[in-house]
A protein has these predicted regions:
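Solvent-exposed interaction patches of small proteins and small membrane subunits
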Residues: 1-137
Length: 137
């Protein structure tokens, strides 16, 4: 019984640490999604695609959103299938490993259409979860 209790406590401790990490990753997704929306606010595609600073700032922030999603636990992603996690992670992989293949229109569509949806959904998760219960905050 002691052994089972110790194993259970270790599993529970690991799980709580992962929840804390997931919360931080979700906060990163919101922060960097917000950056994307600020960067592209009030501009049209032509300026986006011709302004190297705007383009690469958007690219880097979308990449970080994808990295944060990639680092979420499998359990969290499985329990929140409303977001297409594989596609978010896939965009990150393309940006990191094949950025010359990213067409400005694809990045623009991601920033304009997908990022606001992802941000809203993640904010909802953050607000609806009782983090104090899980993380002792």
């Amino acid at each position: 019984v002691r052994m089972l209790r110790r194993v259970w406590n270790e599993i529970k401790s690991w799980y709580m640490r992962e929840l804390v990490r997931d919360k931080g990753r979700l906060e990163d997704i919101v922060e960097y999604s917000s950056n994307v929306l600020k960067i592209i606010d009030g501009i049209e595609f032509e300026e986006f695609s011709s302004n190297i600073l705007v383009y690469f700032a958007t690219m880097k922030n979308v990449e970080i959103v994808g990295e944060a999603a990639y680092m979420l636990t499998k359990e969290f992603k499985a329990s929140h299938p409303e977001i297409p996690w594989k596609q978010v992670e896939g965009m990150r992989h393309v940006l990191v490993h094949g950025y010359s293949q990213v067409l400005p229109r694809i990045l623009w569509a991601t920033a304009k259409e997908n990022i606001p949806e992802i941000k809203a959904q993640v904010e909802k998760y953050l607000n609806e979860t009782d983090w104090e219960h899980y993380c002792g905050e």
